[in-house]
């Protein structure tokens, strides 16, 4: 899927009807990253404290690479 070529109306409809997931490790706080799995292999990520901002859209492959990087520790903050 070419996420840059997606129809805006389709994306808006998908986001309006999206089922957003929050990690069980977030303790129900308001500083959470939320994910929604849309049709056509599109994944949306948003910040629960900034719901007025549009979410970031990823392909399934991009999302899998992102999660893989987290799991491998590749996205840790560098030592200061």
What would you call each of these model-derived segments?
Residues 7-10, 15-18, 48, 52-54, ...:
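Post-signal peptide N-terminal regions of Sec-secreted extracellular proteins
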Residues 1-32:
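N-terminal first-folded block
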Residues 23-68, 80:
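A short, structured beta-strand/loop element
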């Amino acid at each position: 899927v070419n996420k840059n070529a997606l129809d805006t109306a389709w994306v808006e409809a998908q986001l309006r009807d999206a089922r957003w997931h929050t990690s069980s490790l977030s303790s129900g706080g308001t500083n959470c990253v939320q994910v929604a799995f849309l049709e056509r292999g599109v994944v949306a990520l948003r910040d629960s404290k900034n719901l007025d901002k549009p979410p970031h859209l990823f392909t399934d492959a991009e999302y899998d690479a992102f999660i893989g990087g987290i799991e491998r520790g590749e996205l840790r903050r560098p030592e200061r």
